[in-house]
Amino acid sequence: LIEAYEKGKESRIRNCYGVKKADDNLQQEIDATVKYFQAHNPQSIEISQCDSIYKDGNYTYMYITYNLVLDNNQSYPCISTYMVQKKDNNKYYVLSTSEITDDMSKQAATKYALFMKTDAYKQYATDYDKFIKKNPGYEEKIASKLK
């Protein structure tokens, strides 16, 4: 999914969500995320870790840590989380924001707070802080591209 977003490959993105055509909400989500990746203009992506934060029945809350390798060869640390659901075909698909219930959201927030105490999250936070200190104004530059 991360690589599909970076390349702007909408058919591959929709496949990760298990849909052939995105509804308006999902399409907005896809468009915003593709635009976010385009704003960074990465040369490549390096996936660091991908694992579950928690599992509940057919639902799993996943995290992915990765670096966007920029044109100056610096690595911009990122973390993304996704709620996935195991469907009847035994494949997991990402849930769109509109498919996530309030209860799922609350549980995810609680579990994410615990996840923030793990080594994986601490490493991401350390790497991110180092990048921002070396590149003051980077976030503002990206934010201005997203307006």
Each language-model region and where it sits:
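Low-complexity, intrinsically disordered terminal/linker segments enriched in charged
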Residues: 94-147
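Envelope-exposed proteins and targeting segments
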Residues: 58-60, 78-80, 90
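Short, aromatic-enriched amphipathic alpha-helices that serve as compact interaction elements
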Residues: 1-12, 124-134
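"Short basic amphipathic alpha-helical interaction patches in structured regions
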Residues: 76-81, 97-99
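Extracytoplasmic/secreted cell-surface and envelope-processing proteins
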Residues: 71-75, 103-106
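Beta-strand elements of well-folded, non-transmembrane domains
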Residues: 66-70, 84, 88
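Short solvent-exposed beta->alpha transition segments
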Residues: 11-61, 71-74
